[in-house]
């Protein structure tokens, strides 16, 4: 997949922040006289952009990716990271306000020249910011600036908010239509995209590009960014409006996406997000490291249109897996990092304990469709292998125009949660021993797989003494038995234990489903899990 190369390049700049540099080559006098936007004024508003995107969809796709000069095309990630934007040329430096914008240099695999515009909201006019080497500092790089001829454009941008102006960015748009944001920890994690096309289809996946951005100049005391974007690809175009609120504990983006299909699209992904899951409490296949867990996200959380809450722990499967969860007008979904305890990761480099979650909240009626989940095998943490998005049920035909409104919440945990008990953790290991522990003198006579699902919250700690807790478990193949319900005082909840036994030689994934209830009252969200049985000759103990 091209996904691997693109995401690997993105990972290389994960630590790249807009740190101010000294000894810059750029001219301070030039910045004071004109600012970064140096183009001619032209009329602009969102309605005009929507018309432009619609008209563009009616014409043949033009690939505008450029051939970069050798000094940029062959550069290493370290060299790319060493290029610094000159903070004195930040887009709104002269405003002396609460917000600012800086730009990423083109280089490595970032060959799409992205055009940037500054918008005056009072006159509704826009002026382009043209690339020129004077905007950047190349002091600690091997870049030959003599090769930087003409307007190369930019690769993307990053947003800053006081009091960290010119120090630590809070939002980053870089590569294709990828973008990310931080929460209170200041740590980047998973990514979102403007659009996904044919992620799991019979043809090769397509990665649309944001090719132009417009930044609405804020008032001096404003604390919200308004950014417009034009998206282009062989199959679709789009006009986007992002209202970005960088709050103290989270970043909230309100997205208005108008999408136009150039061609029929087999699989259209709305509000796509990309993450990484290598290993966790239940999946240890690729965890032979010093770290107990390695992941940006540990679960897909879904709040269905009918009100049901679902927790689907993520996997790092041996083979690619795709699952579609049908729904109508979903209330929300997201890839969530629920565990933020350092001890459970022991990571002082990538800080997985600080990674944010990403939650999607539809603000328009999305109708029928499915929340799709793609899990790709990965051998390490530098390759993102988890993708989730919404796919409309109605086929997308050439000439179709669609509008989706939604909010994106980048925060430690989603802004909403089930009032019922929620899944705290999932664990899996050797089963078949009814003693409740692994006997030291013998192995169980029959092979089985044990699962432990912990539930917490939802008033479980306030249930009357003697309340009967009933686990309701179903499986798509095999059988489940040997149930135990244990009180966990540490989390003020319960642990449900059960064993799965095969009843045939199938190695197809087994879909497990569990919730707990008392009498006829549901007590928890629904746990969904996909288990991959070993081959029949592996279903034995030593």
UniProtKB/Swiss-Prot annotation:
A GO BP annotation: beta-glucan biosynthetic process
Record's keyword terms, sorted: Periplasm, Signal
Involved pathway(s): Glycan metabolism; osmoregulated periplasmic glucan (OPG) biosynthesis
SUPFAM superfamilies named in the record: E set domains (SSF81296), Galactose mutarotase-like (SSF74650)
A cellular component annotation (GO) from this entry: outer membrane-bounded periplasmic space
Database matches in InterPro entries: Gal_mutarotase_sf_dom, GH-type_carb-bd, Glucan_biosyn_MdoD, Glucan_biosyn_MdoG/MdoD, Glucan_biosyn_MdoG_C, Ig-like_fold, Ig_E-set, TAT_signal
Entry keyword annotation includes RNA-binding: no
Gene3D superfamilies the record matches: 2.70.98.10, Immunoglobulins
Protein modification: Predicted to be exported by the Tat system. The position of the signal peptide cleavage has not been experimentally proven.
Xref: Pfam families: MdoG
Domain of life: Bacteria
GO function terms (MF aspect): carbohydrate binding; catalytic activity
Signal peptide: 1-31
Location of the protein in the cell: Periplasm
Family classification: Belongs to the OpgD/OpgG family.
Role according to the record: Probably involved in the control of the structural glucose backbone of osmoregulated periplasmic glucans (OPGs).
Protein name: Glucans biosynthesis protein D
Lineage of source species: Bacteria, Pseudomonadati, Pseudomonadota, Gammaproteobacteria, Pseudomonadales
């Amino acid at each position: 997949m091209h996904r691997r190369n693109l995401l690997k390049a993105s990972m290389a700049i994960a630590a790249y922040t807009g740190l101010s540099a000294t000894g810059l080559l750029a001219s301070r006098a030039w910045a004071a006289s004109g600012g970064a936007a140096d183009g001619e004024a032209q009329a602009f508003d969102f309605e005009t952009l929507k018309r432009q995107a619609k008209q563009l969809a009616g014409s043949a796709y033009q690939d505008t990716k450029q051939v970069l000069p050798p000094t940029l095309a062959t550069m290493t990630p370290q060299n790319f990271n060493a290029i610094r934007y000159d903070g004195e040329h930040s887009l709104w430096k002269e405003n002396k306000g609460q917000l600012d914008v800086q730009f990423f240099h083109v280089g490595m695999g970032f060959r799409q020249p992205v055009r940037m515009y500054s918008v005056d909201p009072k006159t509704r006019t826009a002026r382009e910011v043209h690339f020129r080497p004077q905007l950047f500092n190349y002091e600690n790089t091997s870049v030959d600036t003599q090769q930087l001829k003409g307007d190369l454009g930019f690769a993307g941008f990053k947003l800053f908010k006081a009091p960290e102006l010119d120090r630590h960015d809070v939002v980053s748009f870089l590569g294709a239509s990828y973008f990310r944001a931080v929460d209170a920890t200041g740590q980047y994690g998973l990514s979102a995209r403007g659009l996904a096309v044919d992620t799991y289809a019979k043809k090769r996946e397509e990665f649309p590009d944001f090719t132009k951005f417009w930044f609405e100049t804020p008032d001096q005391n404003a604390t919200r960014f308004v950014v417009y974007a034009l998206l282009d690809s062989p199959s679709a175009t789009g006009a986007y409006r992002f209202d970005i609120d960088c709050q103290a504990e989270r970043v909230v983006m309100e997205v208005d996406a108008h999408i136009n299909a150039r061609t029929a699209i087999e699989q259209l992904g709305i509000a796509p997000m990309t993450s990484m899951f290598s290993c966790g409490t239940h999946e240890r296949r690729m965890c032979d490291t010093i770290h107990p867990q390695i992941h940006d996200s540990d679960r897909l959380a879904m709040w269905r249109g009918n009100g049901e809450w679902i927790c689907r722990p993520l996997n790092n499967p041996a083979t690619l897996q795709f699952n579609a969860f049908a729904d109508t007008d979903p209330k929300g979904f997201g890839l969530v990092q629920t565990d933020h305890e350092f001890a459970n990761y022991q990571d002082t480099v990538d800080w997985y304990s600080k990674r944010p979650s990403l939650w999607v909240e539809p603000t328009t009626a999305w109708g029928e469709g499915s929340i799709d989940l793609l899990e790709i095998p990965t051998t390490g943490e530098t390759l993102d292998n988890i993708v989730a998005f919404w796919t409309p049920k109605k086929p997308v035909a050439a000439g179709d125009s669609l509008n989706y409104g939604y909010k994106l919440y980048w925060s430690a945990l989603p802004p909403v949660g089930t009032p019922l008990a929620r899944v705290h953790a999932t664990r899996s290991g050797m089963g078949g021993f009814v003693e409740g522990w692994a006997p030291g003198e013998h192995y169980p006579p029959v092979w089985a797989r044990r699962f432990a699902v912990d539930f917490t919250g939802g008033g479980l700690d306030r249930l009357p003494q003697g309340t009967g807790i009933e686990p309701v478990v179903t499986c798509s193949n095999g059988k489940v038995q040997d149930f135990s319900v244990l009180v966990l005082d540490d989390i003020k909840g319960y642990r449900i234990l059960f064993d799965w036994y095969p009843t045939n030689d199938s190695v197809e994934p087994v879909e497990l489903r569990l919730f707990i209830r008392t009498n006829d009252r549901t007590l928890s969200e629904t746990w969904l899990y996909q288990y991959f049985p070993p081959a029949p000759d592996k279903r034995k103990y030593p």
